[in-house]
Swiss-Prot record:
HAMAP family found in the cross-reference section: Asp_tRNA_synth_type1
Residue numbers spanned by region Aspartate: 196-199
Species whose genome carries this gene: Francisella philomiragia subsp. philomiragia (strain ATCC 25017 / CCUG 19701 / FSC 153 / O#319-036)
Gene this protein is translated from: aspS
Location relative to the cell: Cytoplasm
Name listed for the protein in its UniProt record: Aspartate--tRNA(Asp/Asn) ligase
UniProt binding sites for ATP: 218-220, 227, 483, 535-538
Keywords attached to this entry: Aminoacyl-tRNA synthetase, ATP-binding, Cytoplasm, Ligase, Nucleotide-binding, Protein biosynthesis
Reactions accelerated catalytically: tRNA(Asx) + L-aspartate + ATP = L-aspartyl-tRNA(Asx) + AMP + diphosphate
GO molecular function, one term: aspartate-tRNA ligase activity
Alphabetical list of InterPro entries matching this protein: Aa-tRNA-synt_II (IPR004364), aa-tRNA-synth_II (IPR006195), aa-tRNA-synth_II/BPL/LPL (IPR045864), Asp-tRNA-ligase_1 (IPR004524), Asp-tRNA-ligase_1_N (IPR047089), Asp/Asn-tRNA-synth_IIb (IPR002312), AspRS_core (IPR047090), GAD-like_sf (IPR004115)
Residues binding L-aspartate: 172, 218, 449, 490
Amino acid sequence: MRTHYSSDVNEKLQNQKVTICGWVHRRRDHGGVIFLDIRDRTGLVQLVFNPESKAFKVADSLRGEYVIKATGTVNLRPEGQENKNLASGKVEIIGEDLEIVNKSKTIPFQLDDFQSTGEDVKLKYRYIDLRRPEMQNKLITRSKAIRYVRNFLDNNGFLDIETPFLTKATPEGARDYLVPSRNFNGKFYALPQSPQLFKQLLMVSGFDRYYQVVKCFRDEDLRADRQPEFTQIDIEASFIDEAFIMSTMEKMIAGLFDATIGVKFDTPFQVMTYAEAMDKYGSDKPDLRIPLEFVNIKEDMKNEEFKVFSGPANDPEARVVAMRVPGGNDKLSRKKIDEYTKFVGIYGARGLAYIKINSLSEGKEGLQSPIVKNISEETLFKVIEKTGAQVGDVLFFGAAKAKIVNDSMGALRAKIGEDFEIFTKDWAPLWVVDFPMFEKDDNRLYAVHHPFTAPKVDTVEELTKDPENLLSRAYDMVINGYEVGGGSIRIHRQDMQAKVFNLLGISDEEAREKFGFMLDALSYGTPIHGGIAFGVDRLIMLLTNTTNIRDVIAFPKTQTASCLMTEAPSNVSLEQLNELGIAVKKEDK
């Protein structure tokens, strides 16, 4: 039907006849001449119909979002009427033939007025919202990114192999989405939370290098950066170590950013241990663009009478830290500090102590804060020296159980960085390594990553000696405070895998029921292997500079995991339920 896309129409086509197809983005009538901006996924082009044109009457009947096909001759625009914002902005098409392919009702919101439109309306009419150029550009970037990744992995010897969607429910952390079986009454498939076990089985099978761009499903409470169904770049390789995965993947990600948005990363990426990340930033995914760090002052506060600090300072499970904000006196009003005090309360902090440094030569008199009178001058200036604070700076303090300090001060660090844009660079990729193998909660061990992650020990005896302090062979890639990928070297021996299940409170019987096929496979000559998975949606959020994951998915769910457009999930017929042997329990009113 068409000869050219809108953005292809330029001065090189002057005096040539072209045919375009698209939507009427805007219609204007100037002195009897009709000007149309025609939109397709590449952009806009101006179409002009003079009164003497045989298609003028049809052009006069057009309204917004009508779908048209038009043929005309490309002319240079009159001098002074060029539009530098358009690829086609130096030319216009003098219309000769015009066909209305389809009319449109008045759309529920104007594409140029999307910011004042509620998200529920935009999600209900998603096919309208996706006509916006900024939305289309995000999905075009997504397509380019996935194509780049596929090409990179193909060129590096990885095989694209599909794994099942209908599989077995296994305890991987979040709840599974279950699919009832019609053939096996009372039994259920589960949609995979990841292809983890299947990709490891492919390594047992000898495929050596695997990848897949795959949908995964998790029935969990949603956040701004979570969806019930999401896309992973899933990767696994055999006869490798951490260095291979990390060097190969950072080349892929560096190339991806360069190819899609022209951003060049220095390689190799910075590597930081989990312990260092938590110690300095209170987060295992620190945003290293922000030049704010924690300074540990626990020892300095142990003998102070100020119980707010000395209490946690003498608690082995607590932390006391200071964080310097350079030039904070000018930035941080009392109102702003009160706002931050409420903010850290979200993370369990009971308050937010601070000191403003007005002078370093007047003792306590040069320090402004309600807490100054409660702490000795010697300790105060020791803390100032430790943090490197100068006149005009502000110190914030965290003193509580380690998790509360890490969560609250880590979030405060990120918020201050964002609020005042105190970034030292645009991009900060890094690897975080040496994660704990397990974490303890309610007197029980849980896997920090997943139960197939290899520990940094080689024998069952070492594994059971001190499991709470074991490190794992896991690694996460972090960019600007987002964990974009996570992986590990896997357990490749049956005895080690069985013992990890035991340490996690999974009995031999339960392990056999849930993972018997995997344990069997590990006894048939399994190579050393490992891999990683990247969240496509989060990567595209970074590449398109958006904070809402729904903006980078064509048809996303709401935060209640529903689709306003299709009205899913929905009721099904009693006949369907009976076929599946399912009875729906009515909610108590």
